[in-house]
Amino acid sequence: MKVKVYNMDGSEKGETELSAVFETEYRPDLIKRAFLSSFTARLQPKGVDLMAGKRTSAKSIGKGHGRARVQRTGQGAGAFVPQAVGGRRCHPPKVEKILHERVNKKERLKALASAIAASANIEMVKNRGHVVETVPSVPLIVSDDFESLKKTKEVLETFKNLGLDGDVQRAKDGIKIRSGIGKLRGRKYRKPKSVLVVVSGACDAVKASKNLPGVDVISANDLGVMHIAPGADSGRLTLWTESAVEEINKRF
C-alpha cells in the first residue's frame, strides 16, 4: 500500500510504502477489550479503615424491651450500625477487588493493528466526527522536518497547510464544562479529541504540539489503543511522520 508524503507547506514530497498493518481487519471487539485493559490499569485500588464507625462502646441490650435491638450509647443514641449517624458503611469498597481487566499480548497487538488500520479508513474517520474535507490524504504522512518544530505557532501553521486546522477548531469549540460532581474533582472541562500526532521518538515537536486543543503527541513505540482509539471509538484523525511509519513497520 503506497501513500503520498507531504512537506510542511502542503506540497507533495513523494510516496512511501505502508506495511500490511494498515490493512488489518477491523475488530471493534478486540479494540474495546484492549482499551478497557489500558483504562482499568490506571485505576487506583481504594478501601476504608477497617475500624471506621466501630470505635464506640455502644452495645445492644437485647430483646424483650419493646424497642429495636440496635446498639446504643449510654445516652440511648444508636451507633455502630450502618443506618446510624457515624456508623460503619454497609459493603464498603475493598482494596482486594480486582480492577484491572487483563488482555492477552497477542490480542492487544491485534487490537492496536486493527485501530491503526481504522485510522487509515477515511469513512471511519468521518464517522468519528473529524473534519477531513480539507485533508489531502488519509492516512496523512508528513516529512521528518515536522519533528524539529519548536513553536506551537509553527505547528499550527503546518496544520493549516495540511488542512488539519478545521479539526483543531472543532475541538476548541467543543470544550464544555462537565455536568455533575466531576467538575469538583479536577475534571471541570470536557475536551474533545482532535488530531493525534505520531512521531519517531523524543523531539521538539512533542512540546510544541500538545498545547493545541484536543491534540495528543505520542512516539511510535509508545503508541497504544488508548491514543489512537480513545473511548474505544476507532478512526481517529492521525498525522504520521515518515520515521514514525518506519518504526510502526518494524513493530509489526
UniProtKB/Swiss-Prot annotation:
One of its GO terms (cellular component) is ribosome. One of its GO terms (molecular function) is rRNA binding. Gene3D superfamilies: 3.40.1370.10. GO terms for biological process: translation. Keywords: Ribonucleoprotein, Ribosomal protein, RNA-binding, rRNA-binding. Pfam families: Ribosomal_L4 (PF00573). It comes from the Archaea. Part of the 50S ribosomal subunit. NCBIfam families: rpl4p_arch. HAMAP family: Ribosomal_uL4_A. One of the primary rRNA binding proteins, this protein initially binds near the 5'-end of the 23S rRNA. It is important during the early stages of 50S assembly. It makes multiple contacts with different domains of the 23S rRNA in the assembled 50S subunit and ribosome. Belongs to the universal ribosomal protein uL4 family. This is Large ribosomal subunit protein uL4. The gene is rpl4.
